[in-house]
């Protein structure tokens, strides 16, 4: 029997996923979520984000939550300063990017490519383009192909309204790109492909390194398979209530869903009682 992971009693930093965690299903910040982040600051707990989104798609949240620490975009493919300056990037090789795009084409799955600060698509009316436009706050660049940016791709997303089909492609992509890419569903309809070291576990490690923070005193919260890598290395791993069972099983504790203010409840009930400053004053 595998021994349970130790859960640490002191938390000095919380790193949160965005879509499905910090935001509601309608992609909004609740008043309670904003207040929870403020309470973290008062308690001396650092707060930052790690997301599959591009940096530009996180700018409004960074401003609304007054994030003062480095954060991670593209599942860790980019480390970004709170002023949106790029600290570090890890991009797909041109071979891996080409192979993934060919795979998506063979399965008739829409591809989005993020490169040069833009979101690129070959289809303005493709599945979830309108929804992603609302979430990110900017429009895709419609292009005939991706050849001109193939050597500097930050992320490829396979997009489908057939989740079972996309899950099958996920497994095929992992076999095809083993050692060359990180392949994970960021939700049931989006398959993210990034540099092999661009995952949320590496991102949290890098953020802690930049801050001089202790991983054992770091809490993380998320809802999808791309969050499991950070669950495995943090001192406290929290899964959202609507997360798939396998994701919940990888966490230490489960909060309520993002439709039920699960983020703010996790802060109040799980993180703040472990706040480093509060414990130091006891």
Model region roles, listed by residue range:
Residues 17:
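Active-site residues of response regulator receiver
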Residues 3-13, 29-30, 192-282:
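Mg2+-dependent phosphoryl-transfer enzymes with acidic/Ser/Thr/Gly-rich catalytic loops
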Residues 65-67, 74-75, 177-179, 233-234, ...:
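Short, structured coil segments at secondary-structure junctions
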Residues 40, 62, 104, 174-176, ...:
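A generic structural signal for well-ordered alpha-helical segments
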Residues 26-130:
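Active-site phosphate-binding/coordination module
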Residues 33, 58-62, 169, 173, ...:
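Hydrophobic packing residues within well-ordered alpha-helices of enzyme cores
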Residues 107-221, 225-233, 242:
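Conserved acidic, metal-coordinating active-site core of Asp-based
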């Amino acid at each position: 029997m595998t021994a349970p992971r130790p859960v640490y009693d002191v938390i000095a930093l919380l790193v949160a996923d965005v879509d499905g965690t910090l935001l509601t299903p309608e992609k909004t910040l609740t008043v309670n979520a904003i207040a929870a982040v403020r309470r973290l600051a008062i308690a001396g707990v650092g707060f930052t984000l790690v997301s599959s989104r591009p940096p530009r798609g996180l700018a409004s949240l960074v401003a609304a939550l007054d994030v003062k620490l480095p954060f991670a975009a593209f599942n860790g493919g980019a480390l970004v300063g709170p002023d949106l300056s790029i600290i570090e990037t890890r991009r797909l090789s041109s071979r891996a990017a080409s192979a993934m795009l060919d795979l998506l084409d063979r399965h008739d799955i829409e591809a989005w490519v993020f490169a040069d600060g833009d979101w690129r698509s070959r289809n303005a009316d493709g599945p979830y383009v309108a929804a992603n436009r609302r979430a990110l706050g900017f429009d895709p660049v419609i292009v005939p192909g991706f050849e001109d940016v193939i050597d500097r791709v930050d992320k490829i997303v396979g997009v489908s309204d057939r989740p079972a089909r996309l899950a099958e492609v996920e497994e095929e992509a992992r076999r095809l790109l083993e050692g060359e890419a990180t392949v994970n569903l960021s939700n049931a309809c989006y398959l993210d492909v990034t540099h092999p070291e661009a995952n949320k576990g590496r991102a949290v490690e890098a953020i802690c390194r930049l801050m001089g923070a202790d991983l054992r005193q770091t809490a993380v919260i998320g809802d999808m398979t791309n969050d499991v890598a950070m669950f495995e290395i943090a001192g406290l791993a929290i899964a959202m209530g609507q997360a798939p069972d396998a994701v919940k099983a990888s966490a230490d504790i489960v909060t309520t869903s993002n439709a039920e203010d699960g983020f703010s409840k996790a802060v109040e009930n799980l993180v703040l009682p472990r706040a480093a400053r509060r414990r130091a004053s006891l």
